[in-house]
């Protein structure tokens, strides 16, 4: 585990060196680095002059002794310009069709192809084989290609053309770039005099070929937990059910999972976490519509499902409804109920206290605490005589609030269930009950608090998992802040319910 954590620290350090001097390209560098570390491809979409080629050159320095190839495609580009010219000598002397590949795509680790959609069919077909199989057929031999990262770029998306669609599907990570937005970054760009093509990475940080190949074996061992698979499957169902949603091939899903495995590995984890799934927003979009749609779907999944937030919220709501109903039932059972008196000719309903109330001084608790005369009142203390006067004459009830001070008048009525009900100034009401039931109510409240505490512990456990899945180098910080806010909302819900139950 220590070795894995040291690796994570090395990758963080490497990324910081690669990002230096590039403004508002931090996330792009990190995603391209992740793609390079697991042998995937990247498509950069954006206008000219926004450092697309510089990003590709920077990634070369992530690897020790890596070779790079870059080329600007035109409608007239030929395979010779990408894969190397034909050997005249081999053709003349041996009759062999062989290319001289030194310095061209078949012999380089980092490849950048700009204006990729202008490539002709001959280039596209050979390029597809190179991406899929990492092999290049040169005459009568088939050579392995050392390519670790292919970055393609364009200022437009491919047209609806089958010949281009196949290549577009091979570009696993798709990044939509724009010019620098922040004033301070624009100022820093204009003021910088550094040579952007210099190597910013110390040799001891660069990745060796031995390390790269060993890591590929380790990446494949990273586990996809059932909980993360369920989220992925839910996202897949959402996309399938959405009108005009992007078509995502099984191959792309498979390669996306490999990218998530790499993310987990280089963040020092042995299994994919929900945070890694955020990377799917850069893998599954196809056009402007899906580019905007995927972050919305993933935001919902991260704040509701990733750490059981929605289930916990629903369970807390259910507990609140159960408690409310239990309180209502208990209040109806415990509430002081007057006895209805029947008179032969009287039209007005008359009431009296139950016979079992013999005390001259009474303490009556409120089922729902009210603010009366600027005091939060939990119980009232009054003379039995005063209560009888109110029952018979229907005037305001006179009682000491919380048993303190002089008696004060309280608005009160007898409700349809024949129960005395008192009101505050905003007409919020509460029925009353005798102290015999107070001990029972405290015990019941403790039971509800204990049930609530179990939810609190589960929230704490899920929050601990969230913290354990960090830091996550390849995920932007605003995603982490959004997930953190979902835990704050759950905790606030628990606190509010605790106050209600304890009041």
UniProtKB/Swiss-Prot annotation:
EC number(s) reported in the record: 3.6.1.-
Keywords: ATP-binding, Chaperone, Cytoplasm, Hydrolase, Nucleotide-binding
Residues annotated as binding ADP: 23, 49-54, 196
GO-annotated cellular components: cytoplasm
Gene3D superfamilies with a match to the protein in the record: 1.20.58.1510, 2.40.128.430, P-loop containing nucleotide triphosphate hydrolases
Localization per Swiss-Prot or TrEMBL: Cytoplasm
Regulation: ATPase activity is stimulated by ViaA.
PANTHER family: ATPASE RAVA (PTHR32204:SF0)
Self-association and partners: Homohexamer. Interacts with ViaA.
Protein function: Component of the RavA-ViaA chaperone complex, which may act on the membrane to optimize the function of some of the respiratory chains. RavA functions as an ATPase.
Name under which the protein is recorded: Regulatory ATPase RavA
Organism lineage string: Bacteria, Pseudomonadati, Pseudomonadota, Gammaproteobacteria, Enterobacterales
Gene behind the chain: ravA
């Amino acid at each position: 585990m220590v070795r894995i954590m040291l690796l994570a620290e090395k990758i963080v350090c490497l990324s910081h060196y690669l990002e230096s001097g590039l403004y508002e390209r931090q996330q792009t560098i990190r995603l391209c680095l992740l793609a390079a570390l697991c042998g995937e491809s990247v498509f950069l979409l954006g206008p000219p002059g926004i450092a697309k080629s510089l990003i590709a050159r920077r990634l070369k320095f992530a690897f020790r002794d890596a070779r790079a190839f870059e080329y600007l495609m035109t409608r007239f580009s030929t395979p010779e310009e990408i894969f190397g010219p034909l050997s005249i000598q081999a053709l003349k002397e041996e009759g062999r069709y062989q290319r001289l590949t030194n310095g061209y795509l078949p012999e380089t680790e980092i490849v950048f192809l700009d204006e990729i959609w202008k490539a002709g069919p001959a280039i596209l077909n050979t390029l597809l084989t190179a991406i899929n199989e990492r092999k290049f057929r040169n005459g009568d031999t088939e050579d392995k290609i050392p390519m670790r990262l292919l970055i393609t770029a364009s200022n437009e998306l491919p047209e609806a053309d089958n010949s281009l669609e196949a290549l577009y599907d091979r570009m696993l990570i798709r990044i939509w770039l724009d010019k620098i937005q922040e004033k301070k970054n624009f100022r820093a760009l204009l003021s910088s005099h550094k040579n952007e093509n210099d190597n910013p990475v110390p040799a001891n940080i660069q990745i060796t070929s031995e390390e790269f190949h060993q890591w590929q074996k380790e990446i494949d061992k990273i586990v996809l937990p059932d909980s993360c698979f369920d989220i992925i499957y839910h996202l897949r169902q959402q996309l399938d059910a959405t009108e005009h949603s992007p078509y995502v091939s099984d191959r792309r899903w498979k390669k996306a999972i490999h990218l998530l495995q790499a993310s987990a590995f280089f963040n020092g984890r042995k299994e994919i976490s929900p945070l890694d799934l955020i990377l799917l927003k850069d893998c599954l979009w196809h056009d402007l519509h899906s580019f905007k749609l995927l972050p919305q779907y993933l935001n919902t999944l991260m704040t509701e499902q990733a750490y059981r937030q929605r289930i916990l919220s629903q369970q807390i709501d259910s507990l609140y409804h159960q408690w409310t109903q239990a309180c209502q039932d208990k209040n109806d059972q415990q509430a002081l109920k007057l006895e209805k008196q029947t008179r032969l000719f009287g039209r007005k309903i008359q009431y009296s206290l139950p016979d079992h109330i013999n005390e001259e001084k009474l303490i009556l608790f409120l089922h729902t605490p009210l603010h009366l005369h600027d005091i939060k009142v939990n119980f009232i203390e009054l003379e039995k005589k005063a209560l009888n006067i109110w029952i018979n004459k229907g005037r305001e009830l006179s009682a000491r609030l919380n048993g303190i001070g002089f008696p004060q008048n309280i608005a009160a009525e007898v409700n349809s269930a024949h129960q005395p009900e008192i009101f505050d100034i905003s007409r919020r009401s509460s029925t009353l009950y005798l102290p015999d039931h107070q001990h029972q109510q405290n015990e019941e409240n403790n039971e509800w608090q204990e049930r609530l505490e179990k939810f609190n512990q589960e929230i704490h456990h899920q929050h601990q998992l969230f913290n354990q899945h960090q830091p996550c180098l390849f995920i932007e910080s605003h995603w982490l802040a959004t997930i953190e806010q979902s835990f704050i909302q759950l905790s606030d819900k628990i606190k509010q319910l605790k106050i209600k139950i304890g009041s």
